[in-house]
Amino acid sequence: MIILDNSIQTKSKAYSISKLITINTLGPEGTSSEYAAKNFITNFTLLQGVNSKLSLHDTFESCIEKTLQSPLEYTIVPHAYDGIKHFYMRPDLQLLQIFRCDTPMYGLAVRPDFEYTDDMLDKAVIVSHPSPINLIKYFTRKDVTFDLVNSTSAAAKRVKDGLSDIALTNELARQKYGLQFVKTFKSIPMSWSLFGKGEIHDEN
């Protein structure tokens, strides 16, 4: 995608920026991916005069499927996501941009009425997205058992709903679900890739 005057230019066609583009990323609300996508929309698409909306999905793979349907659909993926390597290999996708956006603060969150003690880490199961779990290792030096879910926001929701007691999550999800941090770790320095629909040409 190239922003040129009043159009979005691909190799084969130009689209008026009056058309709405969609930025797809991982949901639900409260994910670090949503935070990064909103940052991208504010600092890139709006400044370029491009009309855009945000669409949240359960998996990055679902985001990519939407992107493959139209050159006006894009997907933002963090480089911490292990499955991103497959997206780079696909001939029907193209890497359009890489940008940095550090995540919100990460920490261990519990319900306000839950009585947390540090020794719980030796036996408790912590609900988390797979990507940030090494924060526990580096900051607590403990070998913790995890219950893995699709996003940090989903982890926080499980604690809010009483399905788990401790979540590794971010500040946005903590606020959204009314949890409190019992430990804070760090805002994770992160880079992100923006993918668009590729243009495949047969070579015979």
Swiss-Prot record:
Catalytic activity: prephenate + H(+) = 3-[(4R)-4-hydroxycyclohexa-1,5-dien-1-yl]-2-oxopropanoate + CO2
Biological process annotations from GO: antibiotic biosynthetic process
Domain of life according to the entry: Bacteria
Pathway: Antibiotic biosynthesis; bacilysin biosynthesis
Molecular function per GO: carboxy-lyase activity
Task performed by this protein: Part of the bacABCDEF operon responsible for the biosynthesis of the nonribosomally synthesized dipeptide antibiotic bacilysin, composed of L-alanine and L-anticapsin. Bacilysin is an irreversible inactivator of the glutaminase domain of glucosamine synthetase. BacA is an unusual prephenate decarboxylase that avoids the typical aromatization of the cyclohexadienol ring of prephenate.
Keywords, sorted A to Z: Antibiotic biosynthesis, Cytoplasm, Lyase
Protein name: Prephenate decarboxylase
GO cellular component, one term: cytoplasm
Subcellular location: Cytoplasm
Enzyme Commission number(s): 4.1.1.100
Gene field: bacA
Major enzyme class: lyase
Family the entry assigns: Belongs to the prephenate decarboxylase family.
Cysteines engaged in disulfide bonds, as pairs: none
